[in-house]
């Protein structure tokens, strides 16, 4: 009798729950040994990885996959190098598990503190990019969590080949294979099962398009770490240094167009707009960026600037398109960001400390920056070593989610025969 998708996912979940208890108590040396052995296995399996990936690429082309998705799917030699190096870098990161902080004696005589512990079982749902298999598996393993990985059907062969290397690493370290499991079925019902198993899965991390994340957020019966959009802003204050403003606004938009930390709307104080917008517009036009602006922006820069609509202020373009709005003051800038932004990353360019501090305090986003490009909103750039994603939620993890974001804390209490009176 053929196993149903629900039965299959239940079997994976039960195995992951059991494995989570073993990986939670694994030593740092044991976890690092698994990571380094997996890196060696990847290095030794380049031909197998390439062959599996070529099969996925051929299937993708036959199914009419868009060029951008085919590019994400491809495991080039450089990307395999990056995966190998990524495993080795995670092995070098400090192990957060078991760390005790804030120990203090209380009047009763007991000593109370907090210990960092794994979350348990983490389900990762992602699309296209097989390198996410390594990112997710390595961070979950190092943070003492078991993980169930459900990649896109278009990358199934690549993910299987990568998972085989991870399994070799686990075996070398004498850790159970169930610490990292890849969902083998391409049936979409597997996603529905994974996100509705609170008895086996402690948290879900979806990485992919907006429709996937919306579905997971709507239907999940376990907590979700996510972000929906990256509608990021740069506000150029009246007290901005012109050179800094131009450099930051250029980089925030044109460094790369697709990432979620790319600026989508530029806000400029009316008192500085005539000095900063014309040179910026020239840079954007030279780089092929389509400009959409408010009435004052169009009056200043010319009719070739498309009239911005209400929808533009809400839009994450992930393309060479930029919305520009001239605002009367800091209050209007903050109000605009808190109304139309996605609570991801927003920046102010200003030499005025009180304006910058107000922006820092009042903009309700996961990352708020002063005189820096929004492109810095990244786990590696924040010194986390790696990230599993970026969260715009306020509970548990917020911003780039690295090792610590995949852990929780429990209270630990030390006594010496103490009883409560």
Curated annotation (Swiss-Prot):
Pathway the protein acts in: Amino-acid biosynthesis; L-proline biosynthesis; L-glutamate 5-semialdehyde from L-glutamate: step 2/2
Listed SUPFAM superfamilies: ALDH-like
PROSITE patterns reported in the protein's UniProt record: PROA (PS01223)
Keyword Transferase belongs to the record: no
Disulfide links within the chain: none
Family from the record: Belongs to the gamma-glutamyl phosphate reductase family.
Purpose: Catalyzes the NADPH-dependent reduction of L-glutamate 5-phosphate into L-glutamate 5-semialdehyde and phosphate. The product spontaneously undergoes cyclization to form 1-pyrroline-5-carboxylate.
Protein name, per record: Gamma-glutamyl phosphate reductase
